[in-house]
Amino acid sequence: MGKLLELEGNLFEVMKEIRDELGSPNDLTIREVALAGSFTRCAVVFLCGLTDKDNVYKYVVRTLQYEEVQNEAAVVQTLLDRFISIAEVGKKTTFPDIINAILAGDTVILIDNIQTAIIINSRAWEKRSLEPPVTEDLIRGPRVGLNEDINVNKMLIRRSLRDPKLRFQSYIMGKRSQKEVTLVYIEDIINPHIVKELDRRLQSIVTDVVLETGTIEQLIQDNNLSPFPQFLNTERPDNIIASLAKGKAAILVDGSPFALIAPLVFVDIFQSVEDHYERWVIGTLLRFLRMGSGIIAVLLPAMYVALVSYHQGLIPSKLAYSIAGAREGVPFPAYIETLMMALTMELIREAGIRLPKPMGQTIGIVGGLVIGEAAVNAGIVNPFLVIIIAVTAIATFSLPVYSITITFRILLFVFVLAATAFGLYGIILALIALAIHITNLTSVGIPYTTPIAPAFYKDWKEEFIRMPKSMLKDRPEYLQTKDSTIRPKERK
């Protein structure tokens, strides 16, 4: 596939090449017709299921059969002028482009003795209706999420962001999948270096199939060995719009209801778009609550193991006696029972996700209660540990970014093992190693710990806490945006 579409005298050879290239599938339709008032033969080619077949027969085939072409020397331009009132039209001259158009759901018109094919946009596959986001449900905010159609997702963004400087930069990726990938940004806000870097990384992708944004994320992230996400996954259009307005970029993939937002910094994982819908005090307190939840999710089980196994003297006397009494008869050391309960919680959580929704919720709640109660009654674990694991699980659920909850769940086991080996000293060493890793991590070249280190104190009022809207007049300084002002100074 690389030659010109040669139709010098035999239209049937080209149709045979198309059938051979596609494997003569049952859904391939090739309708041969003669142009009205002429002996010139042509063929209408499309794939059923990807194309609106009724409209093809109603408008395309009927036009070819019943509307005469007066100037056969300019037949391609004449047909283009006629079909432009029906749909988006174009022309292609190479065989690979013809095949790609057919596979994309377009209708191709081949004309005998003409080296140019007419392409008509007639894509009409089934689409999921707009629904609320599944993974980012909010109390207050829009009730619509992205879906699998990239054009619908673009519409959702444009509908709420009517800015002439909004840019959609498209790519076709995947040697076999031929998926549309779109880079979205606001031209007069975003730092050009971010656009240039993302464009370079996207154009460097070489792969057979692109199925979802996760494929793109893994191919363009800064550090492939880090458990921390370097792009923010979201299915909320308002989250995308808020990020674009800050000076960030978004990546859409056709067939995926999720978008990627870059760059991502560590403080972003504790933020929710809902923070901007509530008063500043509530938004700030919610952020601090999520930060505390992150600490609990990672450190609470490890602290239990360290205190019970190594540093009993740091536990208040009454609490120490209670824990000792509860652990009486438990056959396993603290780290074994902690790892068992943590693994059990992960199994329950995973089962709840994979099972049908009503059954999954039941398994998650009832399964945790039943297994915890049975384990305590059997003397396998103590009640204090059940409470600790339950609080840890609840803390992970309070984090707004699902991908970071997976990271924190992995870190939980790392810190438990460190506490098992060296007690509190192991936890401190693990924290130092984690801090070193995070400070060396970047997202599209932006340090992951920004705006804390390097310090951009001016950004703390928006990124670290959430000050009143009247005080938020500038975009994040660490993004080095073209237009740094959100609210122009009021005239006196």
UniProtKB/Swiss-Prot annotation:
The keyword Zinc appears for this protein? no
Q: Give the residue spans that cross the bilayer.
A: 295-315, 384-404, 410-430
Q: Which of UniProt's keywords are assigned here?
A: Germination, Membrane, Transmembrane, Transmembrane helix
Kindly list the places in or outside the cell where this protein is found, as annotated in its UniProt entry. Membrane
Return the GO cellular component terms, semicolon-separated.
membrane
Its membrane topology is listed as:
Multi-pass membrane protein
Q: Does the keyword Hydrolase apply?
A: no
> Which is an annotated Pfam family here?
GerA
What are its GO biological-process terms?
Answer: spore germination
Chief location of this protein? Answer: membrane
Family according to the record:
Belongs to the GerABKA family.
Cited function: Contributes to the L-alanine germination response.
Q: What is this protein called?
A: Spore germination protein GerLA
Native species of this protein?
A: Bacillus cereus
